[in-house]
């Protein structure tokens, strides 16, 4: 497995089917983001300094321009990262700092809130996913006695409870795209952010 996203390579076939390399060829274009995305929530940010790396020669590094164009088209960017610079600084973006390795706690709290406030998409979950009832039980604390509330996640992540709640409600109201930096796989339990964000997006 590659160093860049080894944990994702392992978990993605079990969560989405296929393999990660195939899925990478289907990534969303910046043009599509500009046309369809009202809110982009970036776990780990969108650091331009190491995006679109090339194995050799020169590559077309379009992310910086893509972010600017999307912001100009009305996309609001949310940077969830310890570093503010993980999203281009000259666009209007909101930054919420998280303790390293705590992104999944915030994702779970968002999923909990979508569930308990009836903001989730039952039709999509029933038609296109399997096993949501087990995930639901985990979110509600039926398996371990710990409901995955925004207050629970705030204590772990350092993100303010009210900010988690407000952002979750905003995500439910708008056409939202969730992104996860490959860097989140390079930590203990690095497969979990990709699994959790897939479940959150499905909701």
Which role does the model predict for each range below?
Residues 3, 46-49, 83-86, 184-185:
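Solvent-exposed loop/turn segments at secondary-structure junctions
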Residues 1-36:
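Anionic-ligand anchoring segments at beta-strand to alpha-helix junctions in alpha/beta enzyme folds, i.e.
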Residues 59-73:
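Catalytic-core regions built around general acid/base machinery
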Residues 7-9, 51-55, 88-93, 107-111, ...:
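Short acidic, glycine/serine/threonine-rich loops at helix termini
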């Amino acid at each position: 497995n590659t160093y860049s996203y080894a944990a994702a390579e392992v978990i993605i076939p079990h969560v989405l089917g296929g393999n990660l390399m195939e899925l990478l060829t289907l990534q969303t274009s910046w043009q599509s983001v500009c046309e369809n995305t009202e809110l982009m929530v970036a776990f780990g940010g969108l650091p331009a300094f190491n995006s679109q790396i090339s194995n050799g020669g020169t590559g077309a590094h379009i992310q910086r321009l893509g972010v600017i164009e999307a912001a100009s088209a009305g996309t609001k960017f949310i940077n969830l990262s310890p570093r503010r610079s993980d999203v281009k600084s000259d666009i209007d973006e909101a930054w919420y700092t998280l303790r390293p390795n705590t992104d999944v706690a915030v994702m779970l709290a968002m999923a909990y809130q979508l569930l308990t406030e009836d903001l989730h998409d039952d039709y999509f979950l029933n038609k296109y996913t399997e096993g949501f009832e087990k995930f639901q039980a985990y979110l509600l604390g039926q398996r371990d006695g710990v409901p995955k509330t925004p207050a629970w996640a705030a204590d772990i992540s350092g993100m303010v409870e009210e900010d988690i709640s407000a952002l979750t409600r905003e995500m439910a109201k708008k056409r939202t795209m969730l992104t996860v930096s490959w860097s989140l796989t390079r930590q203990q339990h690095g497969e979990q952010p990709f699994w959790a964000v897939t479940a959150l997006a499905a909701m």
